[in-house]
Amino acid sequence: MDHYILEMQEITKQFPGVKALDKVDFKARKGEIHALCGENGAGKSTLMKVLSGVYPYGTYQGEILINGQPQKFYTIKDSERAGIAIIYQELALVSELSVAENIFLGNEPLHHHLIDWDKMYIEATKWLKEVGLDVSPGTKIKNLGVGQQQLVEIAKALAKNASILVLDEPTAALTEAEVEILMHILHQLKSKGVTCIYISHKLNEVFAIADNITVLRDGRTIGTVKKDETSQDKIITMMVGRELNRLFPYINHSPGAITLEVRNFSVYNPDNPRKKIVKDVNFYVRKGEVLGIAGLIGSGRTELVTSIYGGYPGKNEGEIWLDGRKIKIKNSEDALSNGIALVPEDRRRQGLVLDMDICKNITLASLKRSYNIMLNESAEIRDAEFFVDKLKIKSPSVEARVGNLSGGNQQKVVLGKALMTNPRVLILDEPTRGIDVGAKYEIYNLINSLVSQGVAIVMVSSELPEILGMSDRILVLCEGRITGEFSREEATEEKIMACATGGK
């Protein structure tokens, strides 16, 4: 008989007007890596908030069992005492405190009612070694990279004797090298009997590390399958409820004349005005073309495209030409007035006002030009509803708060705001980061639609399959310089990575 360390039985969770979870079942064995997959809004986060005590016992129906024993978690502390720890995508660390202080925050070892600093540092060193992190426990969190901070979070969980570790989109901000380190640590934890619940949209990672996969859709359990007995295509079908013909629905484009051209363009570090981040870059994008820009983190991709849009704090130099005419862009208003729009890398911080509704967010960049002095609220609502319908944004109304939407729907609102400006050039910086496969597919189809209408697309992405799957041409940046350019036909992951790392 199978022994399950965790059983969640017929979990139902309702909010006003919405049933977020509908009799969801989820089970995990001791010492397994169990992936939890589903589109944004499928119920994954809600289920984990029930498990962690964020939604306390009594606010949902159903039962949670740990090692066969029913549990009632009224607080997060209750779930932690039962051995459950959750590491969210937004890491919960205090940047000004040391590694040791963060590991034992709220759980400090005491001696005669005072913090036992010696014991804290000795214990912290032990847990850091457990996760393979070679840093001093006295190092401040702000001096660590994101990958190192994530390992501190895992050490913090282990210090609380976690036997069930939940990781929510753990690799969203990690480099490939950091992802490999994380995977190695999770395999080590598995061998020591720790159960890992791995929530991710990146199916290649899921298939690389998981033993079993459970799929949720629309708040229901669709099924649990063994990784070795399924495929990515089958999981995608379970997630979206239909077959996607291809993950990247590329169609042959017929690019026209050059729309945007950048000549001898350099960008300077705002903290060190003499240092160039982007160095004498030249490129162009044609009408009805997707130009992909690849490169490693720190290569200057975001600084380049944000500067072209007028949104980067560091100064720049060089020339920007639009439809054969030299233009000056000092700020985002200049860019928008010239028909250049940007969907930024960080939608929540740079692309949205989370406390405002969908309508206000979509029309925000167009208020001055579209509605003149007097704001026509009915026209504003009508325009917002048009983009909600066009982009298939899932929401009860355009007056819903943007902060309450799923990641995929938030990204569509940012796209709607950009499209509302009727751009000739649309810059997409990490357009599908952190969103589910169904929403990705819809965004790819939108890109195809825009290109067929003659919009020039510049797409920055850290996902090489996305770059290869959707681009007509590909540029590669390394340390601020263009080190490679490929047509769609000649581009490969190996060629791009060689250029991205300074090789040839």
From Swiss-Prot:
Please give the catalytic activity noted in the UniProt record: D-xylose(out) + ATP + H2O = D-xylose(in) + ADP + phosphate + H(+)
Any single GO CC term annotated in Swiss-Prot or TrEMBL for this entry: plasma membrane
Q: Which UniProt keywords apply?
A: ATP-binding, Cell membrane, Membrane, Nucleotide-binding, Repeat, Sugar transport, Translocase, Transport
Q: Which CDD domains match?
A: ABC_Carb_Monos_I, ABC_Carb_Monos_II
Keyword check for ATP-binding, yes or no: yes
Q: Where in the cell is it found?
A: Cell membrane
**InterPro entries tied to this protein:** AAA+_ATPase (IPR003593), ABC_carbohydrate_import_ATPase (IPR050107), ABC_transporter-like_ATP-bd (IPR003439), ABC_transporter-like_CS (IPR017871), P-loop_NTPase (IPR027417)
Enzyme Commission number: 7.5.2.10
Q: Which positions does UniProt annotate for ATP binding?
A: G38, E39, N40, G41, A42, G43, K44, S45
**UniProt keyword Secreted present:** no
Report how it sits in the membrane: Peripheral membrane protein
Superkingdom in the source lineage: Bacteria
- Gene3D superfamilies, alphabetically? P-loop containing nucleotide triphosphate hydrolases
Q: Which top-level enzyme class is recorded in the Swiss-Prot or TrEMBL entry?
A: translocase
Give GO terms: molecular function aspect only: ABC-type D-xylose transporter activity; ATP binding; ATP hydrolysis activity
What residues does the ABC transporter domain cover? 6-243, 262-504
As for what it does, the entry says: Part of the ABC transporter complex XylFGH involved in xylose import. Responsible for energy coupling to the transport system.
What family does the entry list? Belongs to the ABC transporter superfamily. Xylose importer (TC 3.A.1.2.4) family.
- Quaternary state and interactors: The complex is composed of two ATP-binding proteins (XylG), two transmembrane proteins (XylH) and a solute-binding protein (XylF).
Name this protein carries in UniProt: Xylose import ATP-binding protein XylG
